[in-house]
Amino acid sequence: MATNHLVLSGTITRSRSFKSPAGIAHSVIMLEHKSQCFEAEMLRNVYCQMQVIFSGERFESVTEQLKSGVDIEVQGFIALQQSRNGQNRLVLHAENVELKT
């Protein structure tokens, strides 16, 4: 079995919550990540934005806290998602989240 696990920290810039037609609670956020990493012995500024999806009852206790400006660390798996206009993008499906204070 192939490995698919990502850990990413950052600041929430957007959030929304909804229930699927099956009644499953979902929260979707945009996570903005900024860091510095070494690559080829050079310090590199790293920046990305990634959509993160929180699904199911286990995240209901933190849903109210997933608001713009909150710093979090999230662990999960990435998957391809196609938007209505046909654009493909990677999204992170959360398996664990830690609020940073």
UniProtKB/Swiss-Prot annotation:
Keyword Phosphoprotein: no
Any one Gene Ontology BP term: DNA replication, synthesis of primer
Pfam family, one: SSB_1
GO cellular component, as recorded: primosome complex
Domain of life: Bacteria
GO molecular function: single-stranded DNA binding
Cysteines paired by S-S bonds: none
Domain SSB: 1-101
Alphabetical UniProt keywords: DNA replication, DNA-binding, Primosome
The keyword DNA-binding is assigned to this record: yes
Quaternary data: Homodimer. Interacts with PriA and DnaT. Component of the replication restart primosome. Primosome assembly occurs via a 'hand-off' mechanism. PriA binds to replication forks, subsequently PriB then DnaT bind; DnaT then displaces ssDNA to generate the helicase loading substrate.
Family: Belongs to the PriB family.
Known role: Involved in the restart of stalled replication forks, which reloads the replicative helicase on sites other than the origin of replication; the PriA-PriB pathway is the major replication restart pathway. During primosome assembly it facilitates complex formation between PriA and DnaT on DNA; stabilizes PriA on DNA. Stimulates the DNA unwinding activity of PriA helicase.
Listed name of the protein: Replication restart protein PriB
Organism this protein belongs to: Shewanella sediminis (strain HAW-EB3)
